[in-house]
């Protein structure tokens, strides 16, 4: 902090005030003095990318939805309900848990924003259900979620780390959900969109994916900032932890995906898609991916869906996608009406 901001060292953020036994004075967040430029950069990108599922014409997918067999309809509905559970956990536990351990006041606000963003993702699946499904189908899917042991096992796995006394382990867990665990489910709408099915629904998934890329990148970045300050021995301990927790989660994910996609022939490539993104997660944390090209091989038509229609790629600084554009209002001048 510069000398012009002496107040900073004499005060606490509201969370810091509580952690200090409610002693001292609280400061307001100052967006005119940025401790870490990445906080403002990510905040700006997230707010520029803001979207709502109600703006996506999911009803245009009704024709192709009705062309699916009952088995495929159930698979889609269950897959999306499983994703809803993961986003429910991330919204109400994962991102909230990062706020008290933030390095800056602005990081607290970024994670508060992330929590809302993930809430929008969870809501978006509800929009899809209310458009495509009957009430009985929705009820069946939510019943399936609470009764599927393999789904529950992978969903519960990260919870103890979110609430851990170790902020770095919590940070890794917060990065694993948007960085790895969701992608086996994301694979299905991209597979269908490549075959002309549910294109507007897949647009929603692309928008979610765009947000997840930012989410995972930022958590990995904050993890690296903290780890690099530690002694080498401690750094190696955390590296070992990251790989151990990831490999355990991969096994849980494989078990779940093989059951989910049983009879549809999609499990192997969905697993490859998950491993591809597991490698990206590791890179965001500062580690090399151990996965071979063969392990992460995805069919070209599915891979192309990552950028189709939304006109996006995994460089989140490239801007909004074409599938969802927010309007910009500009006051007109007299000269504008001289044709």
Swiss-Prot record:
Give the annotated active site: 125
One Pfam family per UniProt? Ribonuc_red_sm
* Residues binding Fe cation 1: 87, 121
Does the entry feature the keyword Metal-binding, yes or no?
yes
Enzyme class, UniProt record, top EC level: oxidoreductase
Q: Which GO terms describe its biological process?
A: deoxyribonucleotide biosynthetic process
Query: At the top level of its lineage, which domain of life is listed?
Result: Bacteria
Keywords in alphabetical order, please: Deoxyribonucleotide synthesis, Iron, Metal-binding, Oxidoreductase
Q: How is the cofactor bound?
A: Binds 2 iron ions per subunit.
Q: Where does Fe cation 2 bind?
A: 215
- What EC number is given for this enzyme? 1.17.4.1
The residues forming the signal peptide are none
One cellular-component annotation, GO? ribonucleoside-diphosphate reductase complex
Give GO terms: molecular function aspect only.
metal ion binding; ribonucleoside-diphosphate reductase activity, thioredoxin disulfide as acceptor
* Cofactors: Fe cation
Please give the catalytic activity noted in the UniProt record.
a 2'-deoxyribonucleoside 5'-diphosphate + [thioredoxin]-disulfide + H2O = a ribonucleoside 5'-diphosphate + [thioredoxin]-dithiol
Entry annotated with the keyword tRNA processing = no
Which CDD domains does the protein's record reference? Answer: RNRR2
**How does the annotation summarize its subunit structure?**
Tetramer of two alpha and two beta subunits.
Return the similarity comment: Belongs to the ribonucleoside diphosphate reductase small chain family.
Protein's job: Provides the precursors necessary for DNA synthesis. Catalyzes the biosynthesis of deoxyribonucleotides from the corresponding ribonucleotides.
- What name has this protein been given in UniProt? Ribonucleoside-diphosphate reductase subunit beta
Native species: Mycoplasmoides gallisepticum (strain R(low / passage 15 / clone 2)) (Mycoplasma gallisepticum)
């Amino acid at each position: 902090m510069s000398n012009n901001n002496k107040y900073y060292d004499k005060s606490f953020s509201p969370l810091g005030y509580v952690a200090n036994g409610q002693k001292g004075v609280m400061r307001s967040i100052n967006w005119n003095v940025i401790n870490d430029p990445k906080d403002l950069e990510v905040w700006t990108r997230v707010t520029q990318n803001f979207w709502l599922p109600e703006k996506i014409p999911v009803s245009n997918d009704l024709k192709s939805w009705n062309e699916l067999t009952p088995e495929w309809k159930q698979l889609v509905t269950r897959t999306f309900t499983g994703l809803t559970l993961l986003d429910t956990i991330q919204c109400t536990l994962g991102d909230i848990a990062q706020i008290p351990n933030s390095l800056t006041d602005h990081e607290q606000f970024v994670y508060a924003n992330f929590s809302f963003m993930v809430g929008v993702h969870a809501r978006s699946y509800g929009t899809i259900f209310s458009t495509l499904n009957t009430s009985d189908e929705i009820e069946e899917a939510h019943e399936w979620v609470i009764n599927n042991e393999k789904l529950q096992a992978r969903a519960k796995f990260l919870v103890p780390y979110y609430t851990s006394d170790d902020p770095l382990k919590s940070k890794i867990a917060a990065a694993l959900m948007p960085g790895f665990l969701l992608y086996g489910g994301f694979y299905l709408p991209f597979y269908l969109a490549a075959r002309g099915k549910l294109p507007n629904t897949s647009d929603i998934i692309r928008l979610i994916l765009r947000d997840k890329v930012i989410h995972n990148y930022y958590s990995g970045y904050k993890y690296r900032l903290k780890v690099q300050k530690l002694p080498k021995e401690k750094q190696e301990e955390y590296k070992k932890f990251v790989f151990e927790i990831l490999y355990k989660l991969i096994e849980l994910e494989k078990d779940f995906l093989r059951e989910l996609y049983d009879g549809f022939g999609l499990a192997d490539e969905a697993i490859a898609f998950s491993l591809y993104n597991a490698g990206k997660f590791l890179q965001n944390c500062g580690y090399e991916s151990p996965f071979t090209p063969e392990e992460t091989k995805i069919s070209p038509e599915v891979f192309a869906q990552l950028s189709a229609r939304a006109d996006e790629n995994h460089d989140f600084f490239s801007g909004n996608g074409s599938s969802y554009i927010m309007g910009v209002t500009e006051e007109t001048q007299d000269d504008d009406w001289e044709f």
